[in-house]
Amino acid sequence: MRQKFRFAAYVLAGFGLIFLALTIAGARLYTDWLWFQSVNYQRVFATIIISDLGLRLAVGLTFFVLLFLNLMLTRRPLLKVSQNSAIIREKDVLTIQSSPLSQLITPKLLLLAFIALSALMAFLFNFTVAGDWITFQKFLHPTSFGIKDPVFNLDIGFYVFKLPFYIFIYKVINWVILVSAFWVLAAYFVVYFIQGNPGAIFRNISARYHFSFLAAIFFGLKAAGYQLEQYSLLFSHHGAVWGPGYTATHATLLAYKVLTYIALLCALAILINLFLRRFKLVIYSIGVLLIASVLLGGIYPAAVQKFMVTPNEIAMERPYLERNINFTRLAYNLDEIEKRYFPAGRVLTAEDIRANQDTISNIRLWDWEPLQQTYGQLQEMRLYYEFKDIDVDRYIVNGRYRQVMVAARELNQEHLPAQAKTWVNQRLKFTHGYGIAMSPVNELTGEGLPAFFLKDIPPTGPTDLQVTRPEIYYGEASDQYVIVNTRSQEFDYPKGEENVFSTYEGDGGVRVANFLRRLMFAFSLGDYKLLLSSEVDNNSRVLYYRNIRQRVPKIAPFLQYDNDPYIILSEGKLYWMWDAYTTTDKFPYSEPYNKNDNYIRNAVKVVVDAYTGKVDFYISDSSDPLVLTYSKIFPGMFKPLDSMPEDLRRHIRYPVDLFKTQAKMYAVYHMEDPQVFYNKEDKWNLPTEIYASEEKPMEPYYTVIKLPGENKPEYVLILPFTPQNKKNMIAWLAARSDGENYGKLISYSFPKQELVYGPMQVEARINQDTTISQQLTLWDQGGSRVIRGNLFAVPIKDALLYVEPLYLQAEQSRMPELRRVIVAHGEKVVMEPTLDKALEKIFGEGATVQKSVQQPVDVTQPQPEKSIAELANTANQIYDEAMKKIKAGDWAGYGEDLSRLKQVLAELAERAGK
């Protein structure tokens, strides 16, 4: 009785767990539907769900039916075998003994077992097709590339949209046949093994017919597989060529055609054998195909490669190298790069510097890594605020085109004190970040700190930039769901010793509305307190999927995304802009950039409202067939770029990830001559630089410059190139970001007969300068860490100006200060407290017409001595000013006062020591 009760309890618990799992899954599906409705992408959700479930259902049913039919074919022979009786002779007595299997294997039991096994295998197999719904949809909505491959003369759209689905179908049917063969063999084996005669399986005529039939289907599928493998040659790597070279085109391709016919003949032979009953033909067919595969698919191509191609590789591979070069350039848009000549031999004058003040005033002196620490110390204000990242952008500030560093002040609930991590605080009170900090790339205070355009809470500054909607509910640090419009007001921002509270005024999130939704949210979010809280009512709104790195891919999982979404201030509101890419690994003759994909376009710009969470997708490359196909699959999802608000459009920039990929490929594929390409005679490298104290790859950098031959400064992304195994600069690549020039790439090549210093050569000259090296050593010995910033090669007219900032960071401080600027031009290398002074030292007085950088205190200059009383009085005054700024919430000013106080106290200690 106790055992029956325990068994019943286990069964009940099992059903309870299944019911709970189904309830949670159903709740998540329901709340996802509500979420997609809230962002107006319910059609996208419906398309994804219907496509995914429809494909899974079709594959699952196909798998179930085919496996079940195969198992049912074993039913009669298994029943017959299991009912065989055994005759036992003892002395002169014959005893007929029925098989024990006759009691175990019954028609009903076999039927139930076959249904259960087929259903289980179909269910498990369904997990392998997760995500293949997009392959199916692309198959249904292809777009022509307008380019045909040179081998099969098919449009590239066939390989991108059609071929993946054919491969998918082939794999599914192949697995069905293999799994069916396994379970059919297992069923026969179990019966004969129990009877003690497993070797009799293949003497069973039914089993032999069954396996022959499966083998015939397998060989027929193998023939189809060889046809698909012919197409797959276009994305393979053979010798010096990406894509099919001479061997693949003349040997491997021929081998696949012959193997296709051999596989079909083997399938036909096996079918004929069903009538001839010479079952050795099955074994012979398998042997023939295996031998042919080794000879034709392996040995023959290898022999052609070794004895024909390798001794004459360049001559025989030349036409295929041309294809490789041309198609790779197409795949990465390298064929659109405009080539220009850059003399680089000019020596700049003071007049040149004055004439290019728009460029000079936008040279970036602040690197994002040290600046992130400085922002954190000066502008995070409270421990729960966080600057997740520092972004680079450009704005019209007081009528001038300025490059700036900008960061969103997000709220990170993980940084709340342990005692403050209550449910009410984390879900209802601390719901959003607040405002941004923004500083020009080239300005600093007298203490080596950034000079802010926007700072503090609420955001204020000395410019015409204004933030009217500073709340950040959606960002990069918003990982938890929150509930707004509750009976509790939300914490808005700190103000001195008090806090300001607010209520959400947007339409983001999903209304609780009724008890059913509340219950579903409790299940899907795994939070029963949501169900019990008296602070939440029907008008409350649940904000979830708030992290943009989760929010955007939730809507468009078929796109690839850039590593750096960036914050934008537009008409007083805050937005996130994120670059999205369309990619494929099925572009013929193209070399992959990440060991997989061999085609990429920045076809989509995504904009997310930081307050409401609204997500908009804009097509930034309407010539891309992939994004056109996605537009067919999801009508109305993608908007034309022209419909983006004009002020937001001003902040579109060429994405770094795409630029790095193109630069990496262009370093090789700028060589268009097959002979030069084969020998890698003119291969370029991406340069390295000294950052902090280590040699690291040089990153592309944004800057505002007047490109050679252009009339006005513009926002561009730049990266130099160096020759292979050399350190001098050979060229630089620029990507334009402004207006109608957006997306245009220009390659500037230097004359090969002239030496143009590369980044590491400039770094070496800095290290060899005795004045600079001595000063760096003194700072290191004095307890300060010297951080060498990014080295920038700034093109001005037909010359290059190198600029590298230096930061000092005290051992006990987390706030690096910008203390020196190194400038190199021609044969001169100087280090000065400011960029203006460095330029004047190289080019003479009057090289700069405006002082955009405040004069910092020169830490090496002796100051006029003051009395101890004067110093003490000054320290008290600075301390009082700092306390006032704390009460006013001016944390940047407080940080500056602390730096001043530190210097005065150090001088006071020195005077007291005397």
Swiss-Prot record:
The chain crosses the membrane at residues 7-27, 48-68, 109-129, 173-193, 209-229, 252-272, 281-301. Its main location: membrane. The keyword Membrane applies. Belongs to the UPF0182 family. PANTHER family: UPF0182 PROTEIN SLL1060 (PTHR39344:SF1). One of its GO terms (cellular component) is extracellular region. The lineage of its organism: Bacteria, Bacillati, Bacillota, Clostridia, Eubacteriales. Disulfide bonds: none annotated. It is a multi-pass membrane protein. This is UPF0182 protein PTH_1387. The keyword Hydrolase does not apply. It comes from Pelotomaculum thermopropionicum (strain DSM 13744 / JCM 10971 / SI). It is found in: Cell membrane. Keywords: Cell membrane, Membrane, Transmembrane, Transmembrane helix.
